[in-house]
Amino acid sequence: MSTPPKGGIVYHYSLDLAKLDQDRLTVTLEIDGLVPENLTFCFPKIVPGIYGAMDFGQYISGLTALNRKGNPLRVQQLDTNCWSIGQAYDLDKITYQVDDSWEEFGRNTTEGFYRSSASTFKDSTFVINANCLFGYFRGFTQSPLEVVFNKPSSLYAATSLVQTTHSPQQDVYQISSYHDLLDQPILYAQADTSMIQLPNIRVEVACHSTSGEKIAKEVAAFIKPLLLNQAKYLGNQLPVDKYTFLIYHHSDPQQNIYMGDGLEHSNSTLILLYMPLDQQVIKETVYSIASHEFFHILMPLGLHSHEIEDYDFNEPAFSRHLWLYEGMTEYFTIHMPIKTGVQTLEEFCTVLERKVKEMQSFDPDLSLTALSMAPMEKQDQYYNVYLKGALLNLCLDIYLRELSSGEYGVQELVGQLIQKYGPDRPFQDEKLFEEIIQLTGFTELQNFMDNYIKGTEALPLKEMLQKVGLSLKNGQITPSPKPSVEQLQLRRYWL
């Protein structure tokens, strides 16, 4: 059991998965350490990796606080997500019930509802995002936690969390901070796992399918070549040595509908699937989601500003660099297959054409930085970071290759930034653009960033593709009929 840091507290959480009642779990919190007279207990409004308000406090009911004599303390709900507790210096425990956030992963959803950040509870399966179950005291997000899950012996916990003690009916975890707890989802289900051992990294694939079939072995076979190619793309330098894929598959044989959702974490990804038990369809969906989410180990998980490092779960300050966190990640996702030789130029051009076409339906007068600073208010425009953001980085990649005679592109840029900063060394949000110019030595990038990231000028796609012997006309991208030696050489550097 953790000892409270000087002047701090330790959270001790416990719950029993075997006592699920009408989709609700009862959670108990006890505290060690010195606490102030008044405390505010909150559940997140939003969590890292999503950009819309989820208000996880809406799933909490019956919250009570007791003093050391077992008498109730005054509790007042301040808003959807927060409660004030009076005379907290005498606080012994808090109890409350948690309802699950979604009943089943399927087509019934609403815009802005990020189910991969939420939870569902069934007797045989629990998809757990800690932000749904466990709250925090304002001012104490850096305090350590102990979490005890009592459970049926039939349930296996798949997670990147490390169990400090384990028995068939109980798992105990010690976590360094609230942020670290929220960064590690858990899938409790009957065991269906497969291990992938690659150079320098060990990956667990844990699955649950409502079809009742075991699918982890097949899914791991899909993921392994993807990870090998991603490692190759990154120069065989991965920032983590352990990783977990948690995959929940809902099979509805009556519906010919395919959906997937995923959310990245530092050492894991949670993927939700709604589709028939069709290995090819599952492969294509998992491949697409897993590729994007795994690249997030670089950014923002490995490279980010203070706005993400010091994340406020209820009043977040947003970074202006979604063009990097999501746009660059998506560019790596679409660039990696052709760069590693598993995709043809024609296939790559088809992917780009789709991005170009979809981008046309979004507001061209909204800059990427303006979207990034107000994503909750601009939910209808948010998806453009995966379209315009990816195509922007394509332009930047070609431009850097041209300026450096092929020696330097966005892969090298991200590598340099991570080397200088990294997971525990956040950068100053407002200084990243000048930092990029200093790192690369290319002052020409100032106009590029002013025009296309901070500004609203149309991306120079046609011009940049022409530099590598590709023609963009009427939404179609095709090889130029008579490319020059210089164009072909730059294309080889790029692809």
Describe the predicted segments one by one.
Residues 172-180, 240-259, 326, 330-331, ...:
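Carboxylate/His-rich catalytic cores and anion/metal-binding grooves
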Residues 53-62, 66-240, 258-261:
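Non-catalytic architectural context of zinc metalloproteases
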Residues 194-321:
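Juxtacatalytic substrate-recognition/specificity segment
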Residues 1-4, 422-495:
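Beta/coil-rich, acidic/histidine-enriched accessory regions frequently appended to metallopeptidases
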Residues 359-432, 440-446, 454-459:
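Pan-zinc metallopeptidase signature
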Residues 303-312, 316-389, 419:
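Acidic/His/Gly-enriched intrinsically disordered linker/tail segments
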Residues 2-46, 129-130:
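Early extracytoplasmic/domain-onset interaction patches
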Residues 34-65:
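N-terminal, post-signal-peptide region of Sec/Tat-exported proteins
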